[in-house]
Amino acid sequence: MEFQAVVMAVGGGSRMTDLTSSIPKPLLPAGNKPLIWYPLNLLERVGFEEVIVVTTRDVQKALCAEFKMKMKPDIVCIPDDADMGTADSLRYMYPKLKTDVLVLSCDLITDVALHEVVDLFRAYDASLAMLMRKGQDSLEPVPGQKGKKKAVEQRDFIGVDSTGKRLLFMANEADLDEELVIKGSILQKYPRIRFHTDLVDAHLYCLKKYVVDFLMENGSITSIRSELIPYLVRKQFSSASSQQGQEEKEEDLKKKELKSLDIYSFLKEANTLNLAPYDACWNACRGDRWEDLPRSQVRCYVHIMKEGLCSRVSTLGLYMEANRQVPKLLSALCPEEPLVHSSAQIVSKHLVGVDSLIGPETQIGEKSSIKRSVIGSSCLIKDRVTITNCLLMNSVTVEEGSNIQGSVICNNAVIEKGADIKDCLIGSGQRIEAKAKRVNEVIVGSDQLMEI
């Protein structure tokens, strides 16, 4: 077994709590399938027979009861009161990890050719290979913004070599001063570095087993994304001794990069002597000189996905965008499953767009129009209703003559007769009164708050 696959399904969705207060984030519907279905399906498509899923007991129950997979899931439940980062979760399951690992987030929806990332990892005998995508802003408004400016996300500064594969620099702008400081040892080998500020980490990582061994012994690292990967990138082109000397000068790194916990103490001699991977792909390795590869023991690579679907569902806006995109993806992944479920009852079928999904046991009345929308299971949509660019979860009722546009309607909500709703988020179990006009509002229970 070359890799062990690990799906991280622990995070509670802190930036979309109005959605996750009643449904655990891994089970949030996207295209009428739980979010966690997408990384599991990706692994199954490329031939994985086993997967480790790190999650909570609530998600475990759903996985055992509802999921039908060929893969054998090994479900690891973290303690209910634990506040674990991704690195903490890897440490928690460490006894199960015997080989290199492939780590995916439960909220990743992508049609990436997974071998593109894995081949990088194999070809360069990398310590880390990761997936990134070009950032893209949705042109659609986010429900409930009320005209406020979108919060500016902190950008990552990503430096790569001329091939765009070797990851040479990685830092968030919040951690940077007014200048970028690049190691002289990197500039000697790569005098030209391409910097990107428009790349987004997809949270898909191939990691060498010795990196996991290092992580097990270094409890100060809690996050793969924000701590472990920048550490590995910094460690490139450094020997253990030279790095030790540098640490003595850099007080702010001392606590995390103690000599006894240096990544180089976990490297196996075989990793530097085994040149077979380079023989297989030498023609593709123009960016790294042959004589440098063995000495550069820590090697980080990135596959930048420029086309296709690659989205992490971490905010309401990204959740909406994912639901707009998945009908096309599902048509390719599950051609045997119709976009309109066979048990759905639709009076005016010609008014349901081919870009919409309709879940099981849903009823749609006469002269009701559904365009660019995802409708969940057991919904009741009465006559003369117009729904455009929306997501309706399960068991939603929409009464006669209502018009809903650009909105998310959560489980068991009721939209009464003649209501007009635009760019809103309606929380679970909420009721909108008849003939109400709601624009750019977030209508949720008092225990549901969210960062958009």
Curated annotation (Swiss-Prot):
GO BP terms, alphabetized: cytoplasmic translational initiation; oligodendrocyte development; T cell receptor signaling pathway; translational initiation
InterPro entries noted in UniProt: eIF2B_gamma, NTP_transferase_dom, Nucleotide-diphossugar_trans
Modified residues (Phosphoserine): S260
Main location: cytoplasm
Record PTM N-acetylmethionine, positions in chain: M1
GO molecular function, one term: guanyl-nucleotide exchange factor activity
Keyword Cytoplasm on entry: yes
Superkingdom: Eukaryota
Pfam families tied to this protein: LbH_EIF2B, NTP_transferase
Gene Ontology annotations for the cellular component aspect, listed alphabetically: cytoplasm; cytosol; eukaryotic translation initiation factor 2B complex; guanyl-nucleotide exchange factor complex
Keywords: Acetylation, Cytoplasm, Initiation factor, Phosphoprotein, Protein biosynthesis
Activity regulation annotation text: Activated by the chemical integrated stress response (ISR) inhibitor ISRIB which stimulates guanine nucleotide exchange factor activity for both phosphorylated and unphosphorylated eIF2.
Annotated CDD domains: eIF-2B_gamma_N, LbH_eIF2B_gamma_C
Compartmental location: Cytoplasm, Cytosol
Cysteine pairs bridged by disulfides in the record: none
The family this protein is said to belong to: Belongs to the eIF-2B gamma/epsilon subunits family.
Assembly behavior: Component of the translation initiation factor 2B (eIF2B) complex which is a heterodecamer of two sets of five different subunits: alpha, beta, gamma, delta and epsilon. Subunits alpha, beta and delta comprise a regulatory subcomplex and subunits epsilon and gamma comprise a catalytic subcomplex. Within the complex, the hexameric regulatory complex resides at the center, with the two heterodimeric catalytic subcomplexes bound on opposite sides.
Function: Acts as a component of the translation initiation factor 2B (eIF2B) complex, which catalyzes the exchange of GDP for GTP on the eukaryotic initiation factor 2 (eIF2) complex gamma subunit. Its guanine nucleotide exchange factor activity is repressed when bound to eIF2 complex phosphorylated on the alpha subunit, thereby limiting the amount of methionyl-initiator methionine tRNA available to the ribosome and consequently global translation is repressed.
Protein name (Swiss-Prot/TrEMBL): Translation initiation factor eIF2B subunit gamma
Gene source species: Macaca fascicularis (Crab-eating macaque)
Recorded name of the encoding gene: EIF2B3
